Design a protein with these regions (language model features):
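N-terminal polyanion-binding entry modules of DNA glycosylases/AP lyases
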Residues: 1-90
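Short, mixed-charge aromatic SLiMs
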Residues: 45-55, 101-103, 130-131, 135
């Protein structure tokens, strides 16, 4: 019913707004990208905004993210991040619950177009080298 995200692009390259981005970051935590690329489209279909998730049935939301594992931890992070997101000023992503350095670096790169970021994540490094700085 839901098409997975493309394998040849990073999750961050296939989402359209910062809340979706933060959801993707939380889903990617300790989870393979392939599983997230399958689960994220369905999750965003049912919960396209922070408010939609905050008003959703908890068990239904958990059933969608269940294939990713750590269901209770992940669900609680998504809820707390969504609560923070409603009053977030859009600057420092690490102020959102559950968003650490990886999420902050990713947000800087994909949404703020700040390519001076020095990520420690290998995929973000590779993206900057190959897609932004054209280093082979």
């Amino acid at each position: 019913m839901f098409n997975p995200l493309r394998d040849d692009l990073m999750v961050q390259q296939q989402i359209t707004n910062s809340w979706e981005h933060m959801v993707g970051v939380i889903m990617l935590n300790q989870t393979g990208r392939k599983a997230v690329k399958t689960t994220l489209p369905e999750f965003l279909y049912w919960f396209p905004t922070a408010l939609a998730l905050l008003h959703a049935d908890e068990e239904f939301a958990k059933s969608i993210i269940e294939p990713l594992g750590m269901v209770n931890v992940r669900y609680n992070r998504l809820i707390r991040m969504s609560q923070d997101y409603l009053t977030w000023d859009g600057n420092d992503a690490e102020k959102l619950f559950g968003i650490g350095k990886y999420g902050s670096d990713s947000y800087e790169i994909f949404f703020k177009k700040n390519y001076a970021v020095q990520p420690t994540d290998k995929e973000l490094k590779r993206y900057l080298e190959q897609e932004v700085h054209n280093v082979s």
